[in-house]
Design a protein with these regions (language model features):
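Non-catalytic C-terminal accessory region of glycerolipid acyltransferases
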Residues: 2, 6, 71-74, 114, ...
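Structural motif
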Residues: 190, 299, 384-385, 424, ...
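N-terminal phosphate-binding or glycine-rich loops at protein starts, especially the Walker A/P-loop
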Residues: 32-35, 280, 298-327
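Conserved catalytic-core segment of nucleotide-activated headgroup transferases in glycan assembly
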Residues: 118, 133, 142, 310-313, ...
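Catalytic core of membrane glycerolipid acyltransferases/transacylases, capturing the structured
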Residues: 116-175, 201-204, 331, 419
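Active-site and donor-binding regions of nucleotide-sugar-utilizing enzymes
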Residues: 16, 20, 26, 151-152, ...
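A nucleotide-sugar donor-handling region in carbohydrate enzymes
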Residues: 100-103, 419-487
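Membrane-anchoring hydrophobic helices of lipid-metabolizing enzymes
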Residues: 1-124, 157-162, 168, 354
Length: 499
């Protein structure tokens, strides 16, 4: 507790000092410094930067090059740093600032909505400098109630809330938000709410960039219970200190007999509008957040080296993963399994790729190792899980794991890569693997053997062979090799499975 208090006090003191400093500096120069902070922030983010990159890949696929994706993340860092400085300068921002730097579009929609006497919900996301929306509203004379999440550090949180409320906005903490927001709407006031972060297992799943995203239900409940209209609001940073604040059309609906359907409809409408703005201005949204953290939809990418046996083993693991998820309550459609054939230009560059990937050289710098079509295919993919079988794909597996911030599964013992780098390694006994927490040892090759697969294989066999009672089907089991001898126990267990 003492350490937490000390960290809180230090951060609070530093922020207070920065606030005094930036209020003395001209706005443009302050924001220039903010962009330099953003450059530093980009490198400090570390794992968050990987999350942002993976989110962008999931959302846009191959629409942007890797360099463009990194540029979007840098723009996000610039926007966050500039927004923070603008919040610190709130006490010196007045109507003159708003008139000069912020162009408001659609304010008539707020005035018309307030005439209904049921309050208004201004709904936005972590987009642009969303904090400015409440400042503009308060300076325009509206009674603003802003819902804010309580942050980790009490002193710093209290100071930031003081900045938010400096021009008259009422900051509502999430602990007592339900009752206070309802009262504000019943008084025909405005409630400002952000609703674009992961809603956990209790959230409502809506489509967002083609994936199901859990979304908090609160805003829909407020509207349905009070009849308050919901106006999506987005503030776009144009250039430097200039912004454009856009108020969109009402997305609320009249309550029906099925509240669950109503909630879904409202949240899906907002997700659609939010996606439209994020697509237009990708560098102004908060990609570093795990937006799809609790999504039921998982993408599995199976890598193929062109060898049927290797591909079959990888698909067996992918299908088993799907079966486990179905047993856990997910629908079969929630697991998307795709296959990607990896084609190197020749054996030499394949070996080169393995060597450089061990040294940590990124996938994009090694693009020359692949055929142009193969690399274009790789760039367009996204996955939560990577599965591969065979030594030629071990480096590609790890490279894609880093590219997508995904989980990696390798079948067979990696040649030169450390097995600890994989989340799961499935290795047969004859490869003599070391026993580790991420290693599963098998007696033989992985096979897709279950009741459903047997029925599928039997159906395929009947199409090609006229099976009668007089026909006998033989089973051939591979023999010994230089490094492995088939044991009687293994043969008997295989025969038990077959017969």
């Amino acid at each position: 507790m003492r350490r937490s208090f000390l960290a809180d006090y230090i951060l609070y003191t530093v922020v207070r000092f920065l606030a005094v400093l930036f209020r003395l500096l001209p706005l443009r120069f302050s924001l220039w410094i903010g962009r330099r902070f953003g450059d530093v922030l980009y490198y400090l983010f570390g794992n968050r930067r990987l999350i942002a990159y993976a989110n962008l890949k999931a959302a846009f696929g191959g629409r942007y090059t890797p360099a463009q994706l990194k540029g979007i993340i840098k723009s996000e860092c610039h926007n966050l740093s500039q927004s923070f400085i603008e919040v610190l300068k709130f006490p010196v921002f007045g109507n003159e600032y708003v008139d000069k730097y912020i162009k408001v579009e659609g304010e008539d929609k707020i005035k018309a909505a307030l005439k209904r006497g049921r309050g208004v919900i201004l709904l936005t996301g972590h987009f642009g400098n969303w904090e400015l929306s409440s400042l503009v509203g308060a300076l325009r004379g509206y009674k603003m109630n802003v819902l804010a999440r309580w942050q980790k550090f009490d002193m710093l949180n209290g100071y930031l809330n003081k900045m938010r409320s400096f021009r008259g906005a009422n900051v509502v903490s999430k602990g007592d938000s339900r009752e206070m927001i309802m009262r504000a709407l019943n008084r025909n006031e405005i409630a400002g709410i952000l609703s674009d972060q992961d809603g956990g297992k209790r959230g409502e799943y809506v489509k967002f960039f083609g994936r199901l995203a859990s979304t908090p239900k609160g805003v829909a409940h407020f509207s349905l219970k009070t009849g308050a209209p919901i106006l999506p609001v987005f503030i776009i940073r144009q250039k430097g200190p200039y912004h454009r604040l856009v108020i969109e059309e009402d997305i609320s609906i009249t309550a029906s007999d099925d509240i669950n359907v109503d909630i879904h409809e409202i949240l899906q409408r907002f997700a659609k509008v939010l996606q439209m703005y994020v697509e237009r201005y990708p560098g102004q949204w908060l990609w570093i957040h795990k937006r799809w953290k609790t999504t039921p939809t998982k993408y599995v990418l199976v890598l193929s080296d062109g060898k049927a046996g290797h591909l079959k083993q990888s698909l067996s693991v992918a299908n088993a993963f799907n079966e486990v998820r179905v047993e856990s309550g997910y629908a079969p459609r929630d697991t998307k399994i795709e296959t990607l054939e990896v084609k190197f230009k020749n054996r030499f560059v394949r070996t080169l790729f393995e060597l450089f990937s061990v040294l940590g050289v990124g996938l994009n710098r090694l693009s020359f190792c692949f055929t142009s079509r193969a690399f274009d295919d790789i760039k367009s993919r996204y996955a939560d899980f990577i599965i591969s079988c065979g030594s030629s794909l071990t480096g590609v597996n790890l490279s894609l794991k880093k590219e997508f911030n995904a989980k990696s599964i390798v079948i067979m013992k990696p040649n030169i890569h450390n097995v600890n780098k994989y989340d799961l390694a499935i290795i047969p006994t004859h490869d003599r693997p070391e026993l580790r927490s991420n290693v599963v040892v098998t007696k033989g090759a992985v096979a897709d053997i279950n009741k459903a697969s047997f029925e599928r294989y039997a159906s395929e066999l009947r199409k090609n062979i006229n099976i009668t009672k007089d026909n006998i089907i033989g089973v051939l089991i591979g023999g010994d090799s230089k490094t492995y001898i088939l044991q009687p126990e293994l043969i008997n267990s295989i025969l038990d499975e077959v017969l």
